[in-house]
Amino acid sequence: MLYGFSGVILQGAIVTLELALSSVVLAVLIGLVGAGAKLSQNRVTGLIFEGYTTLIRGVPDLVLMLLIFYGLQIALNVVTDSLGIDQIDIDPMVAGIITLGFIYGAYFTETFRGAFMAVPKGHIEAATAFGFTHGQTFRRIMFPAMMRYALPGIGNNWQVILKATALVSLLGLEDVVKATQLAGKSTWEPFYFAVVCGLIYLVFTTVSNGVLLLLERRYSVGVKRADL
């Protein structure tokens, strides 16, 4: 059915999942830091992240990906030349994680910023009244409450990152897109394997929707839903 390319395509699918999961972890970390910076009283860090999110949202993802990838490679070459050592090529997987994480960290910044702002101030005041430290207030009050508001945005960002992994094949990563392209060229069946690639991504997104639904139910425990 896959003309002997099932192993290659399976390996490519695993690489795609690894890339997506690693990228979303980096993006979430950047998003939490960025949201904290934009909500803090420090104007300098707030302006830095404001410029960062504005830049990312104003430039196409593919252009940013190429700029970051080649920019990192050029910077690394300058460092290796100055140290008199051999040139080091950036691994496509590492490059993909950094570029996707950096790009979508801006979107997570806005997602988390809005979610933190939606947490009722009364919750924080109550935690302070009970003698909670800042760390305890964040872990036990703010983060669980924020997640209920952030999950829809997190789900959307995850789906976009998952589909954006297809762009990383342009950097030389042997993901599911590259694997199906190879199979299509080798068998003279490019359309067939393009459909296979699309179906694999559809499976990924369908499973993701199920996981996100479970998470939304988990963080909505105790919250009354309006009856329509």
Swiss-Prot record:
Chain ranges passing through the membrane: 13-33, 59-79, 88-108, 153-173, 195-215
Keyword Ubl conjugation listed: no
Pfam families: BPD_transp_1
GO CC field: ATP-binding cassette (ABC) transporter complex; plasma membrane
UniProt keyword terms in alphabetical order: Amino-acid transport, Cell inner membrane, Cell membrane, Membrane, Transmembrane, Transmembrane helix, Transport
Main localization of the protein described in the UniProt heading: membrane
Residue intervals on the Periplasmic side: 1-12, 80-87, 174-194
Top-level lineage group: Bacteria
Residues in ABC transmembrane type-1 domain copies: 13-212
Gene Ontology biological-process entries: amino acid transport
CDD domains on file: TM_PBP2
Membrane topology of this protein: Multi-pass membrane protein
Location(s), subcellular: Cell inner membrane
GO MF terms held by the record: transmembrane transporter activity
InterPro entries, A to Z: AA_ABC_transptr_permease_3TM, ABC_transp_permease_HisMQ, MetI-like, MetI-like_sf
Side of membrane Cytoplasmic, spans: 34-58, 109-152, 216-228
Family as reported in the entry's similarity comment: Belongs to the binding-protein-dependent transport system permease family. HisMQ subfamily.
NCBIfam families for this protein: HEQRo_perm_3TM, PRK15135.1
Subunit note: The HisPMQJ complex is composed of two ATP-binding proteins (HisP), two transmembrane proteins (HisM and HisQ) and a solute-binding protein (HisJ). The HisPMQ-ArgT complex is composed of two ATP-binding proteins (HisP), two transmembrane proteins (HisM and HisQ) and a solute-binding protein (ArgT).
Function: Part of the ABC transporter complex HisPMQJ involved in histidine transport. Is also part of the ABC transporter complex HisPMQ-ArgT involved in lysine/arginine/ornithine transport. Probably responsible for the translocation of the substrate across the membrane. Required to relay the ATPase-inducing signal from the solute-binding protein to HisP.
PANTHER family from the UniProt entry: CATIONIC AMINO ACID TRANSPORTER, MEMBRANE COMPONENT (PTHR30133), HISTIDINE TRANSPORT SYSTEM PERMEASE PROTEIN HISQ (PTHR30133:SF1)
Protein name according to UniProt: Histidine/lysine/arginine/ornithine transport system permease protein HisQ
